[in-house]
Amino acid sequence: MTTELPGYAELHCVSNFSFLRGASHAEELVVRAAELGYAALAITDECSLAGIVRAHVAAKEVGLKLLVGSEFRLADGPKLVMLAQNRDGYGNLTALITLGRRRAGKGDYHLTRHDLASGVPDCIVLWFATPESTDDEARDFAATFPGRLWITYERLLQPDDDERLTALRRLATTHDLPLV
């Protein structure tokens, strides 16, 4: 029996292509993740894959597994991150980004829950549920993304971190969803 912990993978990281949110270049993030011994890093800029090519080149150079993804804030729902599982997933992700960008003015996007009806095949979906998220939401998302929905907890270093984690654990347990 081994006591070694599994490798750490950052599943949600924005670069300076997420304007006013990310500060570092994608390639700098990759190099730093490798220095810290990460097993993998997901670059997940908001409704964009703009940093992926540079991140890919850097990941090849340092031998880090790069996960390709994007973050979305739905107009009528929560924040989600989608991670492409393969080339088909990458194509589905780019189609969703294109749909959202075409609907809005330059530099913006507009996506709703209805736009996810296809289930965005071949993508893992990280749901940033909140303590206010409902069982109905969990059932709906689980049905839309069968076997590919993970509830995501971000430690924000706020006084309510423990309460948020408890609520998300309950939601994950009730609906048999992984919590990451």
Regions flagged by a language model, labelled:
Residues 1-180:
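Phosphodiester-processing cores and adjacent nucleic acid-binding clamps
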